[in-house]
């Protein structure tokens, strides 16, 4: 009987290496870089496929966990879907990694405006974003105009609206429409102020 056991042990020992022909699990290697995932995600956004876009932005973060553009893009998707808490999280994370990031700063300000809260922080964020020369400047001024109208700071609102009008390209019809709406609101507010004699 002991001899039978020893033969069984030898056979098992010999067969184990013989299984090396079986396929081994291979770790998935993502062929795309973080910027490539971002580009693909942005193309999905343009096509209206927010779920696919979100998946690509998340994949970019798997490649580079501190990739600021992916946090901003996820914040933009969340803001577009009215998920303000999620948008705030993503923009805050972007600002933790890049404190002067103008897009994240302005968009976080817009989140707070939408929530009707933290108006002092809105102004600070917008002013921070304005310190960087970028094509965003008219949008940041629009953010400030919206804030000042909410605060009934009509002179300040008028000033930033004039600045935004002066630098908004005529081809940017969506922003020009928004600025026109703000000017109309400003005119209404001025008309409610009693004339002083």
PLM features per residue range, with description:
Residues 33, 67, 101, 136-137, ...:
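Residue-level recognition of tetratricopeptide repeat
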Residues 29, 63, 97, 131-133, ...:
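Structural marker of alpha-solenoid helical repeat scaffolds
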Residues 36, 70, 104, 139-140, ...:
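TPR alpha-solenoid repeat register
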Residues 38, 45, 72, 79, ...:
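Position-specific recognition of the canonical hydrophobic site in helix A of tetratricopeptide repeat
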Residues 21-27, 143-197:
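Terminal, low-structured helical/coil segments at or just beyond the last alpha-helical repeat
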